[in-house]
Amino acid sequence: MKRRSVCVGDTVYVLAGNDKGKQGKVLRCLKDKVVVEGINVRVKNIKRSQENPKGKRINIEAPLHISNVRLSIDNQPARLFVKVREKGRELWNKHSDGSSSLYRSVRERKG
């Protein structure tokens, strides 16, 4: 499985779909999808029950595919590349002028 560059709590930029161009915070990471706060909101109908005699409608965030979001740095979508070191992986942000800067360092777990 390909490793993700997006983690819970990161701000991401939506590249495709109804919410294209919007930004939000990652709430959950699934296998190849992410749930973003306030993005891809769907309405779920709750049936009538003793707790809800009238029933109700709630809004939930549906997951987006990981390929439709990109990490947002300085309110712009960022292109990241990975360098593998002895201690673990490093995610680097590539700038438009050709330079790059370290964004995050991830230590590999054994086991």
Swiss-Prot record:
- One term of GO molecular function: structural constituent of ribosome
List the InterPro entries hit by this protein, alphabetically. KOW, Rib_uL2_dom2, Ribosomal_uL24, Ribosomal_uL24_CS, Ribosomal_uL24_KOW, Translation_prot_SH3-like_sf
One Pfam match, by short name?
Answer: ribosomal_L24
Keyword check for Cell membrane: no
User: One GO BP annotation here?
Assistant: translation
State a GO cellular component annotated for this protein.
Answer: ribonucleoprotein complex
Q: SMART domains recorded for this chain?
A: KOW
Subunit structure of this chain's protein: Part of the 50S ribosomal subunit.
Q: What does this protein do?
A: One of two assembly initiator proteins, it binds directly to the 5'-end of the 23S rRNA, where it nucleates assembly of the 50S subunit. One of the proteins that surrounds the polypeptide exit tunnel on the outside of the subunit.
Q: Which family does this protein fall into? A: Belongs to the universal ribosomal protein uL24 family.
What the entry lists under HAMAP family is as follows: Ribosomal_uL24_B
Q: What is this protein called?
A: Large ribosomal subunit protein uL24
Which species is listed as the source?
Chlamydia trachomatis serovar A (strain ATCC VR-571B / DSM 19440 / HAR-13)
